[in-house]
A protein has these predicted regions:
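Acidic catalytic loop of the alpha/beta-hydrolase fold
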Residues: 128-132, 159-160
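Short substrate-entry loop that stabilizes the transition state in hydrolases
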Residues: 1-38, 130-133
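Short beta-strand/loop motif that positions the catalytic acidic residue
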Residues: 117, 123-125, 129
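Short alpha-helix in the alpha/beta-hydrolase fold that links the catalytic acid
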Residues: 132-143
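A conserved short beta-strand
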Residues: 94-105
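The conserved beta1-alpha1 loop
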Residues: 1-4, 102, 125-126
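Alpha/beta-hydrolase-fold serine-hydrolase catalytic core, especially in secreted/extracellular enzymes
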Residues: 147, 156-158, 164-210
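Gly/Ser-rich "nucleophile elbow"/oxyanion-hole loop immediately N-terminal to the catalytic nucleophile
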Residues: 38-83, 201
Length: 210
């Protein structure tokens, strides 16, 4: 998981813990937290997180020994971290599903990286997001994608509503934080369960009835 610009990983704690309760090992890098982050370096750190899990899975003395499904990695992130998770997924075939939150354009371009991704993509966005508007970010990423893709837009959802608390330069929405986080967790869990656990009962939860 990649954090947003100038945000602490701890502001996503409840969502990361939610995923853990559904059987996922969740790892989040706290790098590139300053005012001049390098997005490619952030993507590289996301990939290093996967390598760390692989290494721990192979060490007999590790608490993770033999516990990690190293062929079933998913990637996620919020804002800058969402964009960097796109870069990481486009560059690392170990990632089998991508689901991010209000992903922001990056340098190098996350939008331009979308055609290189060949795994399922979920671009969760908020209709009231004034920091990373869905029309110029999530929609552009969706349009550029050639993979199975979905763009769930949380009505009334806002940029900082994906976090446990407001951080630097936050906006506001028309739904509560609790409502937005509940819907975010529902979407994330259903998507990852479908594509990483192959739980076909989640098909309609992700794609609807058609």
């Amino acid at each position: 998981f990649g954090h947003g610009f100038f945000q602490q990983v701890s502001t996503y704690q409840s969502t990361l813990e939610h995923l853990a309760t559904h059987g996922y090992f969740v790892i989040a890098t706290d790098s590139e937290g300053g005012l001049a982050p390098n997005h490619q370096n952030f993507a590289d750190d996301i990939k290093r997180c996967l390598t760390y899990l692989e290494q721990e899975n192979a060490i007999s003395s590790s608490v993770l020994f033999g516990q990690v499904a190293v062929n079933k990695y998913g990637a996620s992130g919020h804002s800058m971290g969402g964009g960097s998770s796109i870069l990481a997924t486009s560059q690392d075939s170990r990632i089998k599903a991508l689901a991010n939150l209000a992903a922001a354009e990056t340098n190098p371009s996350a939008i331009s990286a979308m055609p290189a991704i060949n795994v399922p993509v979920q671009l969760i966005s908020g209709s009231a997001d004034t920091i990373v508007p869905v029309g110029t970010n999530g929609q552009a990423m969706f349009n550029a994608s050639v993979s199975p893709k979905i763009l769930p837009v949380i009505q009334g959802g806002w940029h900082c509503g994906f976090q446990d608390a407001n951080g630097f330069g936050c906006d506001n929405g028309t739904i509560t934080r609790a409502q937005q986080l509940a819907e975010t967790r529902r979407l994330l869990t259903a998507f990852f369960d479908l594509y990483l656990k192959r739980s076909e009962t989640n098909w309609k939860k992700v794609w609807g009835n058609d």
